[in-house]
Amino acid sequence: MYIELSNMTCSVRPVQDHYSKTIDNVLTTLQLVDAPTEEAFDKFTRLVAQFIKVPVALVSFVEEEKDRQFFKSQIGLTGKWAKSRQTPLSHSLCQFVKRDNRPLIIEDAPQDVRVCTNLAITDLGVRAYLGVPVHDPDGNALGALCAIDTQARTWEKSDVDGMVDLAACVSDQISLRAALHRQLVSHRPPSQYAP
């Protein structure tokens, strides 16, 4: 799909991830999706909102197989997005962070050819976006820690550096959860494995 925007061509590329099923399994097994919010993740979104001074901060896990992103933690969303704690990928910039496994820096989303047709702009009010990947213990990107502003803005180097550090802490939290899960599974009696 192509859209003309201020003498620029805006195209949308589909997200494709060869590890989608494996990652979806990790997300479910570690209770990172379809599970209640947790202070272990909420503290990171609070830090992002306070120190980067944005109205919206998310820990978002992307599930291509289910065509959605799930918000393990969020600050600042309202309405149906806050209640459901998820959006379809048509409303996700975090999917690109996961796909490319690197930070995504958007200063003015409606004018950025990489994302200008994404429905997060019109339906969620996203204008500026800074997302950094979060990873499982094997280094696979699972989603993003992101800062969202409803106004165009120039992200400072300190914003990006801080987000990279905080995303690493989110990844550490996921690794701790995975280690605990492995420990619990290894100590289960054999009878608990039977259907």
Model-predicted regions and their roles:
Residues M1-Q86, L166, L176-P195:
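Intrinsically disordered, low-complexity terminal regulatory regions
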Residues V56, V62-F70, G79-R127:
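Regulatory sensory and allosteric helical modules in signal-transduction proteins
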Residues V97, Q111-D112, D159, A168, ...:
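Localized chelating/binding microdomains
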Residues R127-D136:
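A short, aliphatic-rich beta-strand micro-motif
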Residues G139-N140:
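Glycine-biased flexible loop/turn sites that connect beta-strands or occur in inter-domain linkers
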Residues A144-R153:
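Short beta-strand-to-loop transition segments that serve as allosteric relay/switch motifs
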Residues W155-D172:
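Amphipathic alpha-helical "output/dimerization" segments
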